[in-house]
Amino acid sequence: MEPIYKKYSKSKFDENGRLIDFKIDCPENFNFGYDVVDAIASAEPDKKALIYLDENGYERTFTFKEISDLSSKTANFLTKQGIKKGDKVMLILKRNYEYWYTITALHKIGAVAVPATHLLKTEDIVYRVNCIDVKAVICTGEDRVSHCVYESKAKCENLQKLFCVRKDVDGFIRLDEAIKTESADFERVDTKIDEPFILYFTSGTTGYPKPVTHNHTYPLAHIITAAYWQNVKDGGLHLTVSDTGWGKASWGKIYGQWLCGTAVMVYDYERFNSDEILRVIRDYGVTTFCAPPTVYRFIVKNGFKAEDFKNVSYVTTAGESLNPSIIEQFENVTGLLIREGFGQTETTLLIGNLVGCDVKVGSIGKPSPLYNVKIVKDNGEECEPDETGEIVVITNGDRDDGICISRGDSGNDDSRVFIDNVYHTGDLAYADKDGYYWYVSRKDDVIKSSGYRIGPFEIENVLMKHESVQECAITGVPDEERGFVVKATIVLVSGYEGSEELKTELKEYVKTHTAPYKYPRIIEFVHELPKTISGKIRRAEIRGDVK
């Protein structure tokens, strides 16, 4: 059986094997649960879908047949519990394997899956549940998580059902036990591709997170993500480092990967440990790997060997720009070039260093052929080469495949991001003469100092080359004379002390590696940087814009 994604897409390539045109081609009733999971299970029941490993050494492999049966059992039970098409169901399942068959069950029912991270506190859950009228929550039975979920119920008028897995908890229905007596046959529910499928909350680098809803074409838009950016292969094993509550999980832990016929590697851990991640990659024969920039930084800074990636053929990253120095150090050891990509919770892969493309280190690549991506000025005119502007997507009136169908409370907060069918990302970049895109910053992260416009990433990139710097964030601080001055907030590598002498050394280091006006006049050493629940640096919090 050839990978099933070919049934639902049409691709065109140039003489170098580079994707130059891509179209989604699916019936109006396409449903990932039936038409991908069940279809593969029927054709190749023993095909591996998922390898699960926890930090205590417990291991379990799931075939597509097992995922198909478990999801149908779960769908039958949830239906009996009153969950129906269109209902919103929140999933707080960490990296537990129950996530994969449970979300597939929700897709079969036609319910709207709402993945959320286990790091949420009670007030975070209350806000999200009430914002979108969540009907049920399915969570891990872990004490802290289930306690927060239970506490939230009293403050959520429309929250009707609580389910948990792996542990009996008062006030919850034990889902993984309840489904054991259910039938593995589930009658197909009629769903349409333009109906709500999955809902994420934005990571909220500024202000409250906003709900973002995708329709049933969303998994198919991730074919490019998996096949032509991550370069996963039929029968391979892909590892994306992500909690299931983040949008990154949809990019790398289920949809595009299963459409391409590759199994996903799931390592379930409490605290990130780069040595353990490397062991999993090496010992389980991971063939393709994707991780946020922070993970690569820790891997490089903490040390690794070529042997750790002996079976890996392709590595990718997205989430925020990765410093070229890290890319170069990683390639020097492994021979693997980290390929960057760019997208948002509201989209799939918009821009990337796709298979067959030459890579310019530091560039996020070229636009995906699925989208009409441009860089524009504030007045909407397209920018010239090397001119910084905002990344936008020109959509059709019905929104393109993979672009969210609504953003904001009850779909009413689109006005700032969708203007005349143009989706505004809020991210700044420029394109060089060869069409490669170079990320600059979020629009509100640009520092205006003494008439200069300074992007934080270029300074962060310089600082990251210094041996003492583990992580850093550049922000602007108000200044009467200059408008703003540059501030560097730095996490030091273990063993370094945050002295005045080191501050002076770092300032001089920046001056000698970039234009002197960009150097940080203020340096603060901290133990950690404030981040969103998805791991992005909250520069707004460092600036003091958000309390």
Predicted ranges, named:
Residues 80, 104, 108-177, 285, ...:
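Structural core segment of the AMP-binding/adenylate-forming
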Residues 46, 50-104, 121-126, 174-180, ...:
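Conserved AMP-binding/adenylate-forming core of the ANL superfamily
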